[in-house]
Amino acid sequence: MKNSIFGFILLLFTVGAYAQTDQVSISRDADGMRLKVNGEDFMINGMNWDYIPIGTNTITAEFWKKSDDVIKAGLDTEMSLLKNMNVNVIRQYTGVPARWISYIYEKYGLYTLLTHSFGRYGLTIDGVWIEITDYSDPRTQEFLLSEVETLVRDYKDTPGLLMYLLGNENNYGLFWAGAETEDFPDDE
């Protein structure tokens, strides 16, 4: 009985150790701010990455809907090249299953910075397409915050997920008017 209890505790500890995710934080001191992973300074050597074979585009490629064999072959080819280039972080977009973020990290040591467009290209609220996102609209705010909460919940504790990025140059394409923008200094 004593051995069974010890074995069970050892099993829980082992499973817990493998389920641990890296501790990511920002430190601030007199020298400035630094990203830290597991207490060590971390310099991002990163790039955007998406698997888009010749003859396809970001919409038609549907890479994550392929069979596991196709996905592994694509990842193994691409990630080994990135690793050889000393890339340590790739920027991917929502839609990548968490298990592939973990696969990339566990096999190649590459972290993922996961990007949610955060309304950059428009969004659908209550079944209505809104081409230009109005971030001051309470319904838009509620919708976007709900999407981010779901994103965080879905990817919580995913090994290899370094951080989230909300938006992609969301200031481009906006129509600004009003005292604040009209009084913006010309030299800035």
Specify the residue positions occupied by each region the protein language model found.
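Active-site-adjacent substrate/metal-binding segments within catalytic domains
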Residues: D22-K156, G160
